[in-house]
Every structure is written in C-alpha cells, then in structure tokens.
Amino acid sequence: MDQQRKNKEFIINYLTDISGIVKTRALAEKYMTDEVLIGQIEYFDAAFPRYEVYINELIAEGNLVVVRARFKGTHKGDLGGIPPTHKTVEYNFVIRYEIENGKIINHWLIADQMSLMEQLGVVPAAAASH
C-alpha cells in the first residue's frame, strides 16, 4: 500500500475514533504530537462534549491529508465566554494534516465560524447572510 493511502486510512481511523466520545489527551496523543491541535480538541470537547465529525472528502499528497468535513455537537460548555446554549450545531470545516512517522505533527484549519455563531444565536441570522 502506498504512503498516501496509508495516510488517508490513518486520518479516517483517527476521525472515526474521536467522533462521538470524550476526547482525552491520551486518545489525542495516540494520533498526534501537534500540541496546538490537542489543545483545540480539548477546548471544543469541553464546549461541545462528545462532538461528532463526518468526513465529506479526503485528498492526500505526500505526507499531507486534506479533509473536508462537518462538525456536529451540542453546546454544553463555555465557548470563549459564550455560556452554554444547549443548542445543537453543525458547521463545515477543512483541515490539512501533516503526518510524520505515523503521527499528526502539524495542521491548518479553516471553519465556518460565522455559521457556528449564527446557530448559537451570537450573530443574528440576517447579519450572517451579508
């Protein structure tokens, strides 16, 4: 099996393993050394416990895997000063993982934060469409 296929399978396994469960540091460290990403996972799991990730598309080249996916979770914890709304939200994101020696060592993420804020009621729906 070529390395790109292995990297894609690694990311599929990682996202499947973390989806819908409590995300512990030990679980994250099984897949990565990227401390920034570990922190983001812990932060979002505190705000949206047991959030789920649904993969829409994966592309691999060399040691990079790009994922277009959907986040789904219920807002039950503080999110940057936004108290829990108990609303279930879904938004799209794209993340690029850099893999080395069977671990994620770096990432780049872009997410539809406007949609997230609109769904939480922080930004009025009309403002989000402009």
Predicted segment positions?
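C-terminal and inter-domain tail/linker signature
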Residues: M1-H130
